[in-house]
Regions:
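Phosphopantetheine-dependent thiolation modules in NRPS/PKS and related acyl-activating systems
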Residues: 1-43, 48-77
Length: 77
C-alpha cells in the first residue's frame, strides 16, 4: 500500500476537494466537505480497496490522512 494511491482513493470520496490539495498531513476532519456521510464513504472505500474494516472510533481517532493510512497499514500487518 502506498500513500499516493491511498490519497487518490481518499480524494475520490469528495466531490469538490481536488487530490492535489491533500497531503499526508491534511487534517481531514477540517475539510469543508467532510461529513458523517463522507466518513462512511471512506470506511467503505478502505474495506473495498484494502479489505480492512475500520470502526467509527478509529475514524474519529485519526486526525490526519497519515494517521488513517497508519491505522490501515497496522491492520494489514
Amino acid at each position: 500500500m502506498e500513500m499516493k494511491e491511498f490519497i487518490e482513493y481518499f480524494a475520490d470520496q469528495f466531490d469538490d476537494t481536488p487530490v492535489d490539495t491533500l497531503t499526508p498531513e491534511t487534517v481531514f476532519h477540517d475539510l469543508d466537505e467532510y461529513s458523517s456521510i463522507v466518513a462512511l464513504s471512506i470506511i467503505a472505500m478502505i474495506d473495498e480497496e484494502y479489505g480492512v474494516t475500520l470502526t467509527g472510533n478509529e475514524m474519529k481517532a485519526a486526525v490526519t490522512i497519515q494517521d488513517l493510512f497508519n491505522t490501515v497499514q497496522a491492520k494489514l500487518a
